[in-house]
A protein has these predicted regions:
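Multi-pass membrane catalytic core of lipid/isoprenoid biosynthesis enzymes
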Residues: 1-26, 138, 143
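C-terminal membrane-associated helical module and adjoining short loops/tails
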Residues: 21-22, 31-188
């Protein structure tokens, strides 16, 4: 219980923290983790989905016979679309390796190792941006009787981590694109 009179500002703060910060951060963290697992363990060791694949499943379902599955795949397809839209360099890299090597499974070891070496340090940030750190921050701010502090942590600290992680991953993908194109030049 608190004697603070919450005005409209707390709802604005919560909306910004939840919709503009938390949701995109978790989405991209999940995507980067699945990408890392895909390059580490292959398709079987990852849940790396894409918009076209999920949309095809959605289109194949009947609203009448499978309403919950249809709703699920509609949301999942849009979730994937949002992840793909925010990762243009990864999308270019992934498309390039599909074209040149017929998929990541046939990627030369040097390029795969370079990607994993650059991706591995980013996994700590994906972990920070998922549930545990947020839960601890929320519980601590509530126990200290300053629950609005959690919202500020979400908007400031977590957003800075998200921006850094995103920038590093896109730069890594650009490096990998350069490695693929250099390898092509050497082979010609």
């Amino acid at each position: 219980y608190t004697d603070i009179k919450w005005g409209i500002w707390i709802w604005v703060l919560a909306g910004v923290a939840g919709i503009l910060c938390h949701a995109p951060q978790c989405s991209l963290s999940d995507y980067y983790r699945q990408i890392h697992l895909f390059f580490l363990k292959g398709r079987e060791g990852s849940e790396l989905d894409n918009y076209k694949q999920q949309r095809a499943v959605y289109d194949s379902l009947s609203l009448r016979h499978a309403p919950f599955q249809k709703i699920f795949y509609y949301n999942d397809a849009n979730y994937c679309k949002g992840q793909e839209r925010r990762t243009p360099r990864f999308q270019a890299f992934f498309q390039l390796i599909k074209e040149r090597f017929n998929g990541a499974e046939n990627l030369p070891v040097k390029i795969k190792e370079h990607f994993l070496k650059g991706s591995r340090p980013l996994m700590k940030y994906t972990n920070i941006l998922t549930f545990n750190t947020r839960a601890i921050s929320l519980y601590a701010s509530c126990l200290l009787n300053i629950p609005w502090l959690y919202l500020l942590v979400e908007i400031t600290i977590m957003s800075c981590i998200y921006i850094y992680m995103h920038k590093c991953h896109e730069l890594l993908c650009e490096e990998c694109i350069q490695l693929v194109t250099e390898k092509e030049l050497i082979q010609q």
